[in-house]
Amino acid sequence: MTSRKGSKKSNVNTEELLSYYKDMLLIRRFEEKAGQLYGMGLIGGFCHLYIGQEAVVVGLEASAEAGDKRITSYRDHGHMLACGMDPNGVMAELAGRAGGYSKGKGGSMHMFSKEKNFYGGHGIVGAQVPLGAGLAFADKYLENDRVTFTYFGDGAANQGQVYETFNMASLWKLPVIFVIENNQYAMGTSQLRSTSTPDIYTRGAGFDIPGEAVDGMDVLSVKEAGDKAVKHCRAGKGPYILEIKTYRYRGHSMSDPAKYRTREEVQKMREERDAIENIRSILLTGKHASEDDLKSIDKEIKKIVNESAEFAKASPEPELEELYTDIYA
């Protein structure tokens, strides 16, 4: 098992760099707008923002192919946008409107898209991990070469069902990538206060699952690690663990004042390690884009996000009859 530090790959072309920049910026601006709408009362219930962690899902989606699947926890808006789900439908679902992906009944934590192979959004910590293995088992049974990206956090990594899943996935050599989004805090509990193993990916060793730590504030490093993990799974070698070390700028949820860390800590990460600023710098210094080019992209992204907010506001609330549909248990 190895640990990977941030790297700036010179063989990445302009189109790829611009794609990463656009995708990460869309997630950042979308989440900022969602936070605003929550404050205005348009979005209710739980709302967990992905601000700061954008490079994780954008880098891994760049490693995915058509037909690959993804499943995650409650901090899921970024994953939806990164796999190509419509911002209008995502924002409308956040607002509990009929135009949302789950007809306004799922909200922030419980929407999905079969068309994009996005299987949720799950509110129970760690519960999505065995489901991800199940998705991978279906692909192995069908004898295709699809891969499932199963995302969970450093807090969920302490849940028992995760290790039951590791054992089964290794035993059956399932094509599943276990993605540990280590943002340093499980709600308000620092990782160092909740685990005696600072490198969570090493826990796979007992199940003969290879893995590595990745700089999650560098989208190029994430893409490189994602390519390696995907190749491993498609070759029929079984599961792979990526512990992607990242950082969330906002609280655990909109109701979290985040008093367990200092403002200076957050500001230091923003100033020195921000993934979007990192790619922006590469684009400019490498002459892949000009300041005007990036301003044009920023303007385009803001327009998309503002339109998603207006769509959500204009979309009606679900009809009363929807209370009785889509019930299976």
Feature map (PLM): residue ranges:
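A general secondary-structure junction signal
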Residues: 74, 244-246, 327
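Alpha-helix boundary/capping residues
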Residues: 24, 41, 63, 94, ...
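Short acidic, gly/pro-rich beta-turn/loop elements at beta-sheet edges
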Residues: 80-82, 188, 252, 322
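Glycine-rich ThDP/TPP pyrophosphate-binding loop and its adjacent helix/strand module
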Residues: 117-314
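Cofactor-binding active-site loop characterized by glycine-rich and histidine/acidic residues
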Residues: 32-35, 40-172, 193-196, 201, ...
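Conserved acidic/glycine
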Residues: 1-56, 254-329
